[in-house]
A protein has these predicted regions:
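Basic nucleic-acid-binding alpha-helical/helix-turn surface characteristic of O6-alkylguanine DNA
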Residues: 2-148, 196-200
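A generic hydrophobic-helix recognition signal that picks specific residues
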Residues: 36, 161-163
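LysM (lysin motif) carbohydrate-binding repeats in extracellular/periplasmic proteins that recognize
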Residues: 148-151, 192
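Regulatory, non-catalytic segments
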Residues: 152-161
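Major-groove DNA-recognition helix of helix-turn-helix-type DNA-binding domains
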Residues: 166
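Long, intrinsically disordered, low-complexity Ser/Thr/Pro-rich regulatory/activation regions
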Residues: 171-196
């Protein structure tokens, strides 16, 4: 089975890239998952990767999130073997540090995301169509993906985004302009939008 390589912002050199996870075999497979964690201006960040790219960025620490992440991987057909290895996550850490310093507006790290085709379509739209310093509503995203009636489903996909900050679900706001629905908490959403210059 070939992996579909989708480059976000195809004409821009410094943008995140999604490497879609292949369809999973019925038989569970073991997968080495590399991780690292560090303190950021927004609190502790946990980055996880497989050999093909970054699979998750979470707010928090491995000791608190390991069970949740293990269950998520098992649901996606992978039995995780967790290995603390900063070499595998170093590029992501560097880019995130540059982002928080205001030196990076588009991420280049390679992503390997687990999700349904619809979810990946929504996540790709977030990467392609909401640049740094801008926001869109859930309805806007539904129109972008060619399914204007799927606002609720878009909300569900945004809520399940596994890669915080890089896949910018924090840039999706309510139709009325209010900050709603962010897994990291509205305080983090507000912090990120202020950092990007959308909010004062």
């Amino acid at each position: 089975m070939k992996n579909n390589f989708v480059s976000a912002h195809r004409n821009a050199p410094l943008t995140a890239k999604i490497l879609s996870a292949a369809k999973l075999n019925k038989r569970m497979r073991r997968m080495e998952i590399y991780y690292d964690e560090w303190e950021s201006p927004i609190g502790p960040l946990l980055v996880l990767a497989c050999e093909k790219g970054i699979i998750r960025i979470d707010y928090g620490r491995m000791k608190d999130l390991k069970d949740e992440i293990s269950a998520w991987l098992l649901k996606n057909g992978a039995e995780p073997i967790f290995i603390k290895d900063s070499n595998q996550t170093n590029q992501a850490k560097k880019e995130l540090e540059q982002y928080f310093k205001g030196e990076l507006r588009k991420f280049a790290m390679q992503l390997h995301l687990f999700g349904t085709p619809f979810q990946k379509k929504v996540w790709q739209a977030l990467l392609d169509d909401i640049p740094h310093g801008q926001t869109k509503s859930y309805q806007d995203i539904a129109y972008t993906i060619g399914n204007p009636k799927a606002v609720r489903a878009v909300g569900g996909a945004v809520n399940r985004n596994p890669v915080a900050i890089v896949v910018p679900c924090h840039r999706v706001i309510g139709k009325n302009g209010k900050l709603i629905g962010y897994n990291g908490g509205l305080d983090k959403k507000e912090f990120l939008l202020k950092h990007e210059g959308f909010l004062n």
